[in-house]
Swiss-Prot record:
It catalyses: 1-(5-phospho-beta-D-ribosyl)-ATP + diphosphate = 5-phospho-alpha-D-ribose 1-diphosphate + ATP. It is found in: Cytoplasm. Pathway: Amino-acid biosynthesis; L-histidine biosynthesis; L-histidine from 5-phospho-alpha-D-ribose 1-diphosphate: step 1/9. It is an enzyme of class 2 (transferase). Gene3D superfamilies: Periplasmic binding protein-like II. The gene is hisG. Its main location: cytoplasm. This is ATP phosphoribosyltransferase. One of its GO terms (cellular component) is cytoplasm. Belongs to the ATP phosphoribosyltransferase family. Short subfamily.
Amino acid sequence: MTSITIALSKGRIFDDTAPLLKAAGIIPLDDPETSRKLILATNRDDVRLIIVRASDVPTYVQYGAADMGIAGKDVLLEHGGAGLYQPLDLNIARCRMMVAVRSDFDYESAVRRGARVRVATKYLQTAREHFAEKGMHVDLIKLYGSMELAPLVGLADAIVDLVSSGNTLKANNLKAVEEIMPISSRLIINQAALKLKRRAIQPMLEAFSAAITPLTPLSPYPLGATP
């Protein structure tokens, strides 16, 4: 019997993935939010789940420790996608990658003047490409969390981060000034596993595809002001 290992992360992505797993006949026997187990058995003897950090999902799949996984587009862009097949946009965990600044910072003026802007983010590669395309001079500062704090204490002029409702920006007196791209989660498959385990993987791929909620456009985000 061919076994399949699926890499997932806790939180919103796992919650949004549960209906897709169920559509493929896969039900975890433990709740990752309450269980300390990092390897979860399922109702199927041939499928197990491993729980890893969201940023590590592509690495586990790339090197074959997992056959499949679900990762956000933001994570995949930073990873680079080597060794991965990305057959499906699952339309889950949707948000935006945006540039945000303090509400009293004149970002547009800084861009026009060609001022050098300090930007805090954990998405260095994506941010570097975005600002290079705009011809902006930026100093990128790597952070791993609490991005909203950076402009408030003078560490950075701007941040690049994921935004859903915008409530966190509003609570910290920040405003979004640019949308870099929409973000959602993708199904990723190890390229070698797709060849060697296609008969086991293909039915899951088809079940996921059939269960995807049709995409509805994200409503416009109010740039230049806290929502």
